[in-house]
Amino acid sequence: MELGGPGAPRLLPPLLLLLGTGLLRASSHVETRAHAEERLLKKLFSGYNKWSRPVANISDVVLVRFGLSIAQLIDVDEKNQMMTTNVWVKQEWHDYKLRWDPADYENVTSIRIPSELIWRPDIVLYNNADGDFAVTHLTKAHLFHDGRVQWTPPAIYKSSCSIDVTFFPFDQQNCTMKFGSWTYDKAKIDLVNMHSRVDQLDFWESGEWVIVDAVGTYNTRKYECCAEIYPDITYAFVIRRLPLFYTINLIIPCLLISCLTVLVFYLPSECGEKITLCISVLLSLTVFLLLITEIIPSTSLVIPLIGEYLLFTMIFVTLSIVITVFVLNVHHRSPRTHTMPTWVRRVFLDIVPRLLLMKRPSVVKDNCRRLIESMHKMASAPRFWPEPEGEPPATSGTQSLHPPSPSFCIPLDVPAEPGPSCKSPSDQLPAQQPLEAEKASPHASPGPCRPPHGTQAPGLAKARSLSVQHMSSPGEAVEGGIRCRSRSIQYCVPRDDATSEAGGQAAGALASRNTHSAELPPPDRPSPCKCTCKKEPSSVSPSATVKARSTKAPPRHLPLSPALTRAVEGVQYIADHLKAEDTDFSVKEDWKYVAMVIDRIFLWMFIIVCLLGTVGLFLPPWLAGMI
C-alpha cells in the first residue's frame, strides 16, 4: 500500500500514541530519580554544620582510615634534598549526620557530593618542602547511605628527604612521607592504616629510580608545644638509582682517562711526546669535570664515591706529569753534566731490573770499540823492529835458530851515479840516502819483517805491510851495482766490514798525509821496484847466533820521518777521541737505561694503584648490596 494512500491516516494515530507513551514513562523515571537525589540532598544538608566533628557524643573519636597510592615518582633532588611524587590520598570516615534509608529515596544507596560541603579531616603532609601541606585540588566525595564517606583526592607532594650520596651513582635512598592531623589530637581523631604498603598498581615506572619497598607504619608522638598525643602514619620509601646512565657517561670515561695516564709511562722517552700526552690527559679531565659538575650531587655533608675517584684521577694525572719531567731529566743526562753515583748504578742497573724481569739490550758499539782498539795498537806498535847495536837482531829462544836472512836489492838497470837512490814500491815513501842509512844503522844488519810481539790482536783479520827501501851503507856496497835494503811497516785491518771500512779510512788518512801518489798496491801485486834481491850470506855461525840471542840488549827504533810521525800522532788523537766518545756514549746509555727502569717502576705502580682505585670504587656498593 502506497504511503499517503487511503489507509495511511488509519495507522498514524496508533504509532504516535505508542511513541508518546514511551517518552512519558522515560521522563517520569528520570524525573523520579532526580527528584529522589534532590530530596535526599535537601534532607541531608538541611541544618548540616560542616565545622563540627561528625560524632554523636563529644567524647567520641573519629576514626579515619588512611591509605596512599603512588602514581609516579617524579624527581629526587639531591641538591635540595627533596622527593617529588604524584600520589592519591585515600581517606575514609563515618559521618552519622549523613545517613538515610535507601527505601525512602527509591533505593539510592550512594551519591557524589562536593567535598567542600562536608566535614573533612585536616590531614596534611608534615615533611612538606613546597608549602602546600594540604590537598589543593578538592574533588567530590563518595557518600554512602550508612554515613561512610570516601574521599581520594590526587596530590603532588614535594617531601623533604635526607639524601645520602656516599655511593653515588650506586646509591639507595630512604625517603619518608609523614601524614597526620594538624589540629586534632588522638582523643579527637585517630588514624587507622588502610594498607600496610603503598599501593603501586597504577605506578608509572621512572627512568632513573626504582621503588624497592614502600611500607606504612602508624606512630604516635608527643610534641614539645602541646601536651596531647598526635597520631601519624609514616610511609617509608626505599628507592634505588638506576646506574646505567652514570656508568656510561661518568665512570667509564674516568677509567679510560686513568688508563691513558698509565700509558704515559709506557711511552719511550726518545719520542718526546710524554709531556704532551700528560698535559692532554689533564686538560681532558678538566673539561670532563666541568661537564659533570651538574651531574654529581653538590652537597658538603658527604663526599660522593665518584667525587673521590675523580679527585684520585686528578692527583694521578698530576703525579704522572711530575714523574715524567723527572724521568726526562734523567734520560737526557750525560757525563759532562752529571756523575752517576755508585748506588744508582747498583740499584737501577743491577738490582731493580732483575726484580722487574728486565733484560738490558746488548752493547751497540762493539764494532766501534774494536776499531778503537785496533787503531790504538796501530799507533802504539813499533813500525821497525828493535835491533841490538853491533849484533844481529835477537829473537826469543823458542824461535828458529836460523833467522831469516835480510834481503838486499841490487838495481839492474840503474847506472852507478853519485848519490843514487832506490825507489820504494809505488813511489809512496822516499828512499833514504846512503848517509842517512849509515847514520841510522851503521853496524846493524837489516832483519826480516816480523809480526808484532805476542798473539794477533782480537778483531784483526789480516795484516798488510808497507815496504820501505833504502840504500845500504857504503861499506856494504857490492861490485856491479848498488845494494838496497828493504824494511816493511805492518798495519792490521779489523774483521768486521764496518770496522774494516773505518780502519781502511784511518790507514788511508795515514798514507795520505805521508805520500803524494796513489794508494799502496795490494800485497799480492808485484813490486814495481826494479831491483833484484838476493840473500846475504850469513857470516855468523849457529853457535854465535844462539849466543847472541841469549844476550839482552836495549831495543832501538829506527827514526821515522816527520810526516809519518805526524800521521801517527793524528791516528793516536783520533783513537783517543773515539775512545772518549765511546765512554761518553756508554754513560749516556746507562742514564737512559736508568730512566727506562724508573719508567717501568712507575708503570707497574700506577697500574696497581689504578686497579685498586677501580676496585675501591665498586667494592663498597657491592658489599652494601647496592650493585
UniProtKB/Swiss-Prot annotation:
Residue spans crossing the bilayer: 243-267, 275-293, 309-330, 601-619
Pfam families: Neur_chan_LBD, Neur_chan_memb
One Gene Ontology cellular component: plasma membrane
Reaction equations catalysed: Ca(2+)(in) = Ca(2+)(out); K(+)(in) = K(+)(out); Na(+)(in) = Na(+)(out)
Gene Ontology MF terms: acetylcholine receptor activity; acetylcholine-gated monoatomic cation-selective channel activity
Topological domain ranges for the Extracellular compartment: 29-242
GO biological process per UniProt: acetylcholine receptor signaling pathway; behavioral response to nicotine; cognition; DNA repair; membrane depolarization; monoatomic ion transmembrane transport; nervous system process; neuromuscular synaptic transmission
Lipidation (S-palmitoyl cysteine): C271
Amino acids binding Ca(2+): V76, E78
Disulfide-bonded cysteines: C161-C175, C225-C226
Modified residues (Phosphoserine): S424, S538, S541
Membrane topology reported for the UniProt record: Multi-pass membrane protein
Gene3D superfamilies membership: Neurotransmitter-gated ion-channel ligand-binding domain, Neurotransmitter-gated ion-channel transmembrane domain
Protein origin, superkingdom: Eukaryota
CDD domains assigned: LGIC_TM_nAChR (cd19064)
Keyword Cell membrane applies: yes
Activity modulation notes: Activated by a myriad of ligands such as acetylcholine, cytisine, nicotine, choline and epibatidine. Channel potentiation by calcium is stoichiometry-selective, CHRNA4:CHRNB2 nACh receptor is achieved by calcium association with topographically distinct sites framed by anionic residues within the CHRNA4 subunit and between the CHRNA4 and CHRNB2 subunits. nAChR activity is inhibited by the antagonist alpha-conotoxins BuIA, PnIA, GID and MII, small disulfide-constrained peptides from cone snails.
Disordered, as annotated region: 382-479, 497-559
Sites carrying sugar chains: N57, N107, N174
Localization annotation: Synaptic cell membrane; Cell membrane
Keyword Protein biosynthesis carried by entry: no
Described function: Component of neuronal acetylcholine receptors (nAChRs) that function as pentameric, ligand-gated cation channels with high calcium permeability among other activities. nAChRs are excitatory neurotrasnmitter receptors formed by a collection of nAChR subunits known to mediate synaptic transmission in the nervous system and the neuromuscular junction. Each nAchR subunit confers differential attributes to channel properties, including activation, deactivation and desensitization kinetics, pH sensitivity, cation permeability, and binding to allosteric modulators.
SUBUNIT field: Neuronal AChR is composed of two different types of subunits: alpha and beta. CHRNA4 forms heteropentameric neuronal acetylcholine receptors with CHRNB2 and CHRNB4, as well as CHRNA5 and CHRNB3 as accesory subunits. Found in two major stoichiometric forms, LS (low agonist sensitivity): (CHRNA4)3:(CHRNB2)2 and HS (high agonist sensitivity): (CHRNA4)2:(CHRNB2)3, the two stoichiometric forms differ in their unitary conductance, calcium permeability, ACh sensitivity and potentiation by divalent cation. Cells produce predominantly an (CHRNA4)3:(CHRNB2)2 nAChR.
Protein family (similarity comment): Belongs to the ligand-gated ion channel (TC 1.A.9) family. Acetylcholine receptor (TC 1.A.9.1) subfamily. Alpha-4/CHRNA4 sub-subfamily.
Protein name per the record: Neuronal acetylcholine receptor subunit alpha-4
Species per Swiss-Prot/TrEMBL record: Pan troglodytes
Taxonomy of the source species: Eukaryota, Metazoa, Chordata, Craniata, Vertebrata
